[in-house]
Amino acid sequence: MDWTTETPNTEPSLVTATPSTTESLVDPAKMKVGYFGNEFPHDDLHDLSRRLYNWSKDRQHTLLATFINEATAAVRQEVRLLPATLRTLIPPFETIFSLVSHADLRHGPLGGCIDGMLLCAVQLATFIGYYEDSTEDTFHWHNADACLAGLGTGLLSTVAVSVSPTLADMPVTGAEVVRMAFRLGILVHEVSRILQAPTSDGGPGDSWAYVVPDAVADDVQSELDAFHDAKKTPESSKVFISALSRTSVTISGPPTRLKDLFLVSDYFRDRRFVPLPVYGGLCHASHVYTKEHVDSIVNTESSSLVSLDSRLAPRVPIFATSNGKPYSAKTVSGLFRNIVEELLTQRIEWDNVIEGVIQHAKCTAVSEALVLTFRTSLPARDLVEALNSESLPFKGRTQDLVPWVTKPQAEPRGPRGAQQAKIAIVGMSCRLPGGADDTGKFWEILNQGLDVHKKVPADRFDVETHCDPSGERLNTSLTPYGCFIDEPGLFDAPFFNMSPREAVQTDPMQRLAIVTAYEALERAGYVANRTASTKLHRIGTFYGQASDDYREVNTAQEIGTYFITGGCRAFGPGRINYFFKFSGPSYSIDTACSSGLATIHVACNSLWNGDTDMAVAGGMNVLTNSDAFAGLSKGHFLSKTPNACKTWDCEADGYCRADGVATVIMKRLEDAEADNDNILGVILAAGTNHSANAVSITHPHAGHQADLTREILSKAAIDPLDVSYVEMHGTGTQAGDAQEIQSVVDVFAPLSSTKRRATKQPLYIGAVKANVGHGEAVAGSTALLKVLLMLQKKTIPPHVGIKNAINPGFPKDLDKRNLHIAYHRGNTSIVLEEGPVRSIQDSDKDTRPMHVVAVSAKSKVSLKGNLQRLIHYLEANPDVSLTHLGYTTTARRHHHNHRIAVSTSAVPHLVRQLNSHLQSADTHKPIPSTGAPPVVFVFTGQGAAHRSMNLELFRDSPCFRSQMLYLDSLCQSQGFPSIIPAVDGSYPQDHTHPPTVTQLALVCIELALVAYWESLGVRPEVVVGHSLGEYAALHVAGVLSAADTIYLVGQRARMLERKCQIGSHKMLAVRAALDEVQSKANGKPFEVACLNGPKDTVLSGTVSEMEALAEELEQSGLKCYHLDVAFAFHSAQTDPILQELEETAQTGVLFQPPRLPIISPLLAKVIFDEKTVNAKYICRATRETVNFVAAVEKALAMSTVDETMVWIEIGPHPVCVGFVRSIMSTVNMTVPSFRRGENNWQTLSQSLAAVHAAGVEVDWNEFHRPFEHGLRLLDIPTYAWNNKTYWHQYNGDWALTKGNNFYDSKKKSAAAGSPLAAAPVSSLRTSLVHRVIEESFSGTAGKVIVQSDMMQADFLAAAWGHQMNGAGVVTSSIHADIAWTLGKYLLDSLKPNSRKSVVDMEISNLVVREGLVAQKNRSVPQLIQVSISTADVDSGVAYLEWHNVTNDGVSLADQEPIVTAQIRYGTAGDYLSSWVPALHLVQGRIEALSQLADDGIANRLSNSMAYLLFADRLVDYADRYRGMQSVVLHGLEAFADVKTKPDDEGGVWTVPPFFIDSVCHLAGFVMNVSDAIDTKNNFCVTPGWGSLRMARPLVAGGRYRSYVKMIPTAEDPTVYLGDVYVLEGDEIIGVMQGMKFRRYPRVLLNRFFTPADIKNPASGSMSCAKGARSSAQSTKSPANVAESVPTPAPAPVPAPEPVPVQRNKQDTAAPPVAASDSTAAKALDLVAAEAAIELSDLQDDVSFASLGVDSLMSLVIAEKLRQQLGITVSGSLFLEYPTVRDLRVWLDEYYS
């Protein structure tokens, strides 16, 4: 809506001032005038609004963003209140500026309303942003000299400025202005359409206002009156004067009345007039609008106005456009009323406004009036001209506020928040058709314009039998063509901790997804937790997948353990998260063909929402199922011709299916820049919608596609004409291509008169499907990779889809329509641009002379491959920067156990070193799997360094420098001189500093070096200091603070300076043992200062004594040299200071307990306690001998240090590490920190390379941090996989023949004759039996099947009442209750008149093959199924089986039951009679045990003690299970007094399990508590019993006595048998006969009894045995572990044939024989020891099964391999590697 009242101005402004040169507006001599006109700035409104929105994303423009959000919310609220007829005219909008692009809306009935609202929004957004952006001009609008003026709707904008005391108030007040403008526009529209009906075409109609130049108002009014009288015009329809100026009159009225006026009026007919662009309706009409109209707009009771009135008020005067006087309102709502009334009812007289401004300027006595405008306009020019009148004492000038919007951003300030961020793509990888195993090969296909289609390969299916072009054969494809990945089965399973079996059963697309994820992460320079954006919990995975071919066809032929985890889609991204330990979200997304790009959109949203900081995203598709080919062919989706997609071809007849796996790594742009990543491309916006209005679900819709594109361009604040390339979906279908090209040209290449592409703005389009086919779920990701490669190569590859002529359905005017890169896909689209260009400043360049290049791998094969790849890269790029290469291979790579590191200064040297390592790669040893080697810090004493140093580390390393400066400040604060001149190169090397400076400098260097090493992640486990270096060692060990260390060293040095003469004594180093020195000294005097090594001795004495001694010793052939020290330490020269030194240490220093072991050269021992180091120690260490040799030898003897440790010398030159090597000849490694005369960085590089290769984890990122601005991540070769083929081939043609009704008809006939079909479902339910799912009864035969959920409260409580290893375990007493329940139910159903109860039923032959452990997650069910059946109940026998059930209720009844038992029907009387003969024997043994207890021979235990011991050994029972009141135990025999406890929890039981357990678990107590069993190293569990009968019911509170004696069996000494007798008074009422227990090594307890849902799969675990049962519910244990019930152990599972694994052709060499110290040799030693065989029996061709290695022994050996060798495998190890050769080869390859 616009109420313009003057001719549109086309002249430039007269006087302008740019914002950058504006003087301070607080100057009282200057007046500010804010002018808000009634027309948009002359800039392109689309561009202006887009720029404002873009600026709102900037972190500096938070108020601008707030205003846009508040104004948008206000308008949305108003839209919701509109009547439906108007509400439907306004489309959904993301922000108010989104409405700018809706041309139909702005030119439609509500055009005036929308434009009026947009005018206020643009003005206020520009105004707010101007003040946020300006560094010179500030928001001071409440001085007495400021004033405001406006025209039309712009007058409303002045309210926000007038009432806002600060800029921060303007977003809210501005939003209210926008709300008022919208309401005003709606009112004017509604009133005006009553005066004149809208046009039938819905367009804007004609103008409601004409300007008549050179007219006189009185004459105009007279003519109007005459016209109205003649026409008898109704009052409301009269034409009237709406505005006056000195040069013109503006008349307004209904458009038809205006036209009529100019046709019939003599006065107007011949006059010049100008129709104004006022199409929204009538304003300034007092005869039309009333007070009620004003009230409808300004509702003073609305919450928003009430809030504003309560805290704000008008402050800056606004001049009324009618009389030029300031509005007098005192409230915000009052001011709005004044202005709305002005706009609706008052005439505009601009000259009055000008006069009002002039009078205001005169009153404030200003010298200058500055008019702030939004570009130039006639009213503003008239105002400035008037202000510049010669008669006035001031001058006027304008200042345009718009230029800040259109200026380029001076420097990147970053987005306001995550939602405004751009998304950087920092890594990518792929496996695509045509041999494109990397992005380089993919680009070759694109650049050469190749079409890589081919016939379906044989490894997918037989194309001859599964393809029929005629379409006559059932279930066949019409086309034999596709685009396929070469060898999709190749995979490095051990690298990803997968067994061969798991790899074969895992979908190859999921395998390739994790491979490309690793490669993409590697190319992105990802290192876990290196930066804030790489924290593991902030990384998520997002993959598109639209099919499960491999699971449906390949692995479905032989369903195994990993059928679900290896085949279901959700496990693909989940596996990536699991392997990399990402704990962010993992999504598998299926949106058909847009899956790959929809996934990118979801990943972007995750980054924008702040849910993640890094996203691993992509798509995957590997085609193996002929069904999809057949179905797509039948649906007319696929092309029948030999080609990839014929995109845009006139004969396009469908698409060509394709494989593909692609991964990209994404971060927010500012994070990528902060992380120093390579930015391959930047995503500005992304969106997804659906073609809801398409003619079918598979048909695209141009309108929806165009809507989506406009939406994301709006989000990105990008002009469509700035887009130069569009990558299209381009499937090669007639309808799809035509619809898509239409949506593209509509948005990116319009032909409108106001917006079209210039000649220099060509638009290019392309579609990658023409090269590599349609990858379906990976199609979008593939196209994204293409565009990223185009950005890298700065080339648009040729399009090869048009084989004949262009699609005739395309627009005919493409040439006339002459994309920032835009990337557009179906109904998911993203906008891409190139990444920021980064340059390296001279000040950022890396000055280090030497660099570390690291190579690592998980296997020897890959190590060789990685070395070869890097060598080839260097040969191809000889000018590569070693700076960047070192940074890339160290800080930006993950490091594996096979490590090589080279410190180098030139590429040729590096190549030679790498070739040398390549030659020796076969004998290379990996770092220990037990972890990084421990580190010893050894601190140098005096005499090793130059007198003055120039430390490069002090110059370059902020860490080292800050530490040195901090320590220097401590020195000076304690009154010592500065040490910095001794280290910063201020003096020449031979300059001698005072001893205080020299000694303090040495110690401070060492302290700073420790801080530096620790910043690299290298920390000591032991410390030792030599002489003065011991002070630094004491600090690092925590004994002395840094301040106390400096205090002691400085005070000691000052004492020496004060009390000892410099140069009077010397220290002499001799290359000989002390004995040899003494024998060759010929009696010359000396003192022994240091014993450094077996042949390194330092002597002290006076100068003359040392010179004479040196001469004598050198004549004897010994090498001697004088140390460059001021004093002879550890000699009589130091005696004068000793007492004072001890007193100083006693009073001035606080000694703390050591945190680390300290090797003491003074005491020749290792210090651990807090008392040894004290003031006396400090004194003695100064005077007495440094016995470094004895100290290290003592530490070695105590195992404080050993040969595996890494020794790092902390000091200015390596001295002590030489001593260490002479003492420990086999020491692993010794390295220096600095070396005299060598650049610090060179020394450190060499040392870091060595310790890294030895296994010490170095924080390389920290090492490179000082130079990171000058470092770049190189795109070097990715990991060389040790690939083998893992592939389950689809066999036969069952995919074709399955399409019949044979099985359906068979199932129907079987169901019709089955007694189960009509059987009713019973209401039977107890605490342990929950649901009868089937039952059938026929004569004396019957069957009942029930299911129970272990997670139900009663069942769960029963299981958790019997805890083992911290887990709830289903005791056999639970099985007994279930058996008796079903036994009675079956009998009652078949024999309703039977009077038998459970006391008449025997549970026999209970065999528990798998223990049931309650899972931890109680939110999902844990189901079991139990069946009971009998062919003839009169036979007295029924059979029971227990099976696992999947969570969705699918029974595993086709597998071996986990528990079996029988019910035998008898009579209680017979049972009781049969036990009478045994009664006296049992009672006799009970009396004998009681007597033994009285004699102190047997143990009598109370209830609490018994169960305390039971819990300590194995089972922790809940209170209601604890029925044994006392126990008498002797050897393997015991009796117990039992009292059963009531069920306070109200369960429904047949025989409560805690009753059964209470009277029977005495046997388990004996087996796990008795001292006759080695319970420390073993535990015993029962696999079942022979018979359980209870001839009397067990009752709550009943008192019973149990007796048992266990005996080992003759066949197997690990198996024990016994009978448990239950007595009530003098009667045996129950017997558990043949209760069996088996002994197991305690090391297996955790393996057997851990809930399945919290077991951690081993990192290198092997798969289960072929055919082995897989159940989430059961623990693969030898038996149920209830102590009250026994079972035979399962037989060993026969070893299967190994999974066929095809090696690469080059990988055919036989493995080397295992060295005696290799991991393989140690593992075989362990196997031999455990199997009790000779090592010589383990020949290569021997199978482990033949040696008696059964399933149990496998579990024991697996556990010991983990504990002793750090190798984690599953118990199926010997099934995967059945022979000695198989195992040795595997261990040699991956663990040697």
Swiss-Prot record:
Q: Which reaction does it catalyse?
A: holo-[ACP] + 8 malonyl-CoA + 8 H(+) = atrochrysone carboxyl-[ACP] + 8 CO2 + 8 CoA + 2 H2O
The Ketosynthase family 3 (KS3) domain sits at: 420-834
Spell out the residue ranges making up region: N-terminal acylcarrier protein transacylase domain (SAT). Answer: 44-284
Q: CDD domains from the entry?
A: PKS (cd00833)
- Superkingdom assignment: Eukaryota
Q: What class does this enzyme belong to in the EC scheme?
A: transferase
Its Enzyme Commission number? 2.3.1.-
Where is region (Malonyl-CoA:ACP transacylase (MAT) domain) located? Answer: 937-1256
UniProtKB keywords: Multifunctional enzyme, Phosphopantetheine, Phosphoprotein, Transferase
Gene ablation phenotype (knockout)? Impairs the production of neosartorin.
What GO MF annotations does this protein's record show?
Answer: 3-oxoacyl-[acyl-carrier-protein] synthase activity; fatty acid synthase activity; phosphopantetheine binding
User: Which residues lie within the region annotated Disordered?
Assistant: 1-21, 1658-1715
Under Pfam families, the record lists: Acyl_transf_1 (PF00698), CurL-like_PKS_C (PF22621), ketoacyl-synt (PF00109), Ketoacyl-synt_C (PF02801), PP-binding (PF00550), PS-DH (PF14765), SAT (PF16073)
| Function, as annotated | Atrochrysone carboxylic acid synthase; part of the gene cluster that mediates the biosynthesis of the tetrahydroxanthone dimer neosartorin, which exhibits antibacterial activity. The two different monomeric units appear to be synthesized by the same set of enzymes, among which the Baeyer-Villiger monooxygenase nsrF is the key enzyme for the divergence of the biosynthetic routes. The pathway begins with the synthesis of atrochrysone thioester by the polyketide synthase nsrB.
The record's domain comment reads: Multidomain protein; including a starter unit:ACP transacylase (SAT) that selects the starter unit; a ketosynthase (KS) that catalyzes repeated decarboxylative condensation to elongate the polyketide backbone; a malonyl-CoA:ACP transacylase (MAT) that selects and transfers the extender unit malonyl-CoA; a product template (PT) domain that controls the immediate cyclization regioselectivity of the reactive polyketide backbone; and an acyl-carrier protein (ACP) that serves as the tether of the growing and completed polyketide via its phosphopantetheinyl arm.
Name of the protein described by the UniProt record: Atrochrysone carboxylic acid synthase nsrB
Q: What is the organism of origin for this protein? A: Aspergillus novofumigatus (strain IBT 16806)
Gene that produces this protein = nsrB
